Amino acid sequence: MKPIFIVALLFSTCLVNAKPSINDADIKREPEPNVAVPPCGDCYQQVGNTCVRVPSLCPARKREPEPNVAVPPCGDCYQQVGNTCVRVPSLCPARKREPEPNVAVPPCGDCYQQVGNTCVRVPSLCPARKREPEPNVAVPPCGDCYQQVGNTCVRVPSLCPARKREPENQDLWS
């Protein structure tokens, strides 16, 4: 609204609502003319002291055409057709396959390290081998007069059988 119109409207409202200090009965007032202040605009017609909107008096509104843009804009594989996006496979980039994780199945054991999808033996990763102690057996086993002590045979005379003594000075050829 224009500032002049607002001022005039406020002024007229104040005049209508103002109470005169003199009694209304004492003063003869002339009737106010049937004119709307300010005058009615384009789409309005004066009816009594008011303006009434009459649509047939209004000029046609000019509508701004909406731009033919899809909101949000179309993505990689899509092309705008009117206000919509249509999928066009030829516009799609080649799909990137996710590489399979580099995990050996089954997972590598103690002495092995994964290289790519395979397990490679790494001796430094191997735990020290526990050697089984050799049994405490002398090789060859101890004979008649001997007893095993650790890995050796020790002669024990008490284990020896009594020797048969051959007669002395016997002629062997007779």
From Swiss-Prot:
Residues 1-18 form the signal peptide. Residues 19-33, 61-67, 95-101, 129-135, 163-174 form a propeptide. Transmembrane segments: none annotated. Disulfide bonds join C40-C51, C43-C58, C74-C85, C77-C92, C108-C119, C111-C126, C142-C153, C145-C160. It is found in: Secreted; Nematocyst. It comes from the Eukaryota. Keywords: Cleavage on pair of basic residues, Disulfide bond, Hydroxylation, Nematocyst, Neurotoxin, Repeat, Secreted, Signal, Toxin. The modification Hydroxyproline is found at P39, P73, P107, P141. The keyword Lyase does not apply. One of its GO terms (cellular component) is extracellular region. Neurotoxin that paralyzes freshwater crabs at high concentration. Belongs to the sea anemone BBH family. This is U-stichotoxin-Hau2a. It comes from Heteractis aurora (Banded sea anemone). The lineage of its organism: Eukaryota, Metazoa, Cnidaria, Anthozoa, Hexacorallia.
